[in-house]
Amino acid sequence: MAENNAQNKAKLISETRRRFEAEYVTEKSEKYDSRDVERLQQDDNWVESYLYWRHNVVDETLKMLDESFQWRKEFSVNDLSESSIPRWLLELGGIYLHGYDKEGNKLFWIRVKYHIKDQKTIMDKKKLIAFWLERYAKRENGKPITVMFDMSETGLNSIDMDFVRFIINCFKVYYPKYLSKIVIFDMPWIMNAAFKIVKSWLGPEAVSLLKFTSKNEIQEYVSVEYLPPHMGGTDPFKYSYPPLVDDDFQTPLCENGPIASEDETSSKEDIEGDGKETLETISNEEPPALSEKSNPTESVSKKDENEKVDSKTKTFKKPLSVFKGPLLHISPAEELYFGSIESGEKKTLIVLTNVTKNIVAFKVRTTAPEKYRVKPSNSSCDPGASIDIIVSPHGGLTVSAQDRFLIMAAEMEQSSGTGPAELSQFWKEVPRNKVMEHRLRCHTVESSKPNSLMLKDSISTMSDKTSEDLYLQLNRLLESNRKLEDQLQRSIWFQQLLLALTMVLLDFVVSFFYSLYN
């Protein structure tokens, strides 16, 4: 069955490419960017995303590709950069990428209160949207995104329906299959009619992706660690520019050697989990690769040290999946699997293999630098060699599915040194377009507890969740009750006013007829 589906998908992709080339490119090639046409012939995922959004109907997919490619050329999407956007707009902080929702999707923030409807700036705002989406699409090919419309403190002068429609079209036509959901926070009641129009733009299939929330419901979609305080969250993030804020990856703990107290804590944890093995092999920050100038004595000590590392990492399960990049093969390909706390297997392994003819420098960064220790996190790898990187949660901190790791790699000149000072200088000077990047998600393996213990934990968790749900429902009920009371009071007031006006009118009519007949 799966094989048939794969064959059908391949046929649809091939037919789409062939027909687009024959029916559109020959006549309208000047309307498209040649880079987009070339990418269409090479990137199966890109073609499949358009087919998916048009339910695998090739005729509809071709129309969508035509519209999308014309838009990409009109906006010069492939050439958009920071210099294409007015600096004041980047400094404003109305549109940016930051954080993740509970499903691990990146958050695309639209702070509506910072937008003023103005025909002079609408094109720049649209280009900023396109800039962020294209930047994200190139880094996270095919991974969904959650749009956060923050409408708190929003007035009518901030509502631009043309701009909203453009954002909707970006996900309907220009970046299909990228939309996870649209979360609308604290929408003013006066905008209800306007968003009925938005629903019609989305279409019946995508309407379910629209989530209207207040402070009470927002945590159903985003955890407090990625919500700002005005949404009831604890995220200390404050927007500023420069630099661009979408790079949430930071240096993990102890890149340049652990702090004494932290090292002692880690040593105790490892002694308990691994018997008498020491941390020397995994806390060594020296680059594993040997330079050409190293002497035989150093070579012997390095060899012994590497053998120790090998014996240490034998306790880890080698990842099976492999991402094949131009500089490094990285294993695992997409997800880091950490053992459960109960199993004691908290650490995991990343294997890097240099597939070039030169030394490759690498760095490992993470979205949660306070939670993880990475050894080594900044080093180099000889041609054809492999390096094992050990990643472990720090202390008692737990692994989250929202955590991410970024591996950065760049090819070094043969004459370059690989010491800490040389590596630091190298990363300052290497051009951005020479750096290979690959991202990894985190995943916790289910606990291997006995069923009886699992049942107790499950009952306890269900009890806590039920209590929390009841509390939320009670709050909502009280809020609804308060609104009903307000409406009732207003209704009584209107009835009293109407009664008073009726009495005045009746008195006037009686007086009129009395004066008429007397």
Swiss-Prot record:
Chain positions covered by the region annotation Disordered: 252-312
The protein's topology relative to the membrane is: Single-pass type IV membrane protein
Q: What is this protein called?
A: Motile sperm domain-containing protein 2
Gene name per UniProt: Mospd2
What are the start and end residues of every segment in region (Required for FFAT motif binding and phosphorylated FFAT motif binding)?
365-366
- Which InterPro entries does this entry report, sorted A to Z? CRAL-TRIO_dom, CRAL-TRIO_dom_sf, CRAL/TRIO_N_dom_sf, ER-organelle_contact, Ig-like_fold, MSP_dom, PapD-like_sf
Topological region Cytoplasmic: 1-496
Spell out the residues of the site Required for FFAT motif binding. 374
* Basic and acidic residues compositional bias, start-end: 265-279, 300-312
